[in-house]
């Protein structure tokens, strides 16, 4: 079944039109209960500094959850990293500064949610 699904997805992807537009890399964090406010602040600061350390990053926006809907599943922080294209995102993912950030942040993070999309505008 997995093979059939993989073939179906591959066939669909091959027929899909190539989208153009800025790529948005959305990352949401749920911190461990043991994460201190100081550790969380250090992670916020370090994530924001990636723009000045990785040239392919167009912008980084972030904030904490303020939704009244109570559907956050414990995720408190959201970061949106903008790239010109998928190639730049791929460069970012393997960049030494990104890897250093991940190594620093991971011990305090209980869960992470990542979603990328190509913006229509």
Enumerate the language-model features and the residues they cover:
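Generic hydrophobic-segment detector
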Residues: 3, 18, 53, 100-101
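Short S/T/G/P-rich N-terminal loop/turn motif that feeds into the first structured element of a domain
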Residues: 9-76, 84-91, 117-121
């Amino acid at each position: 079944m997995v093979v059939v699904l993989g073939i179906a997805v591959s066939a669909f992807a091959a027929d899909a039109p190539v989208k153009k537009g800025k790529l948005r890399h959305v990352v949401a964090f749920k911190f461990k209960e043991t994460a201190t406010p100081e550790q969380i602040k250090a992670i916020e600061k370090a994530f924001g500094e990636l723009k000045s350390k990785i040239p392919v990053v167009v912008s980084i926006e972030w904030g904490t959850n303020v939704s009244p809907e109570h559907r956050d599943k414990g995720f408190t922080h959201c970061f949106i990293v903008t790239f010109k294209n998928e190639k730049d995102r791929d460069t970012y993912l393997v960049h030494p500064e990104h890897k250093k950030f991940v190594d620093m942040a991971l011990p305090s993070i209980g869960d992470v949610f990542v979603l990328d999309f190509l913006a229509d505008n």
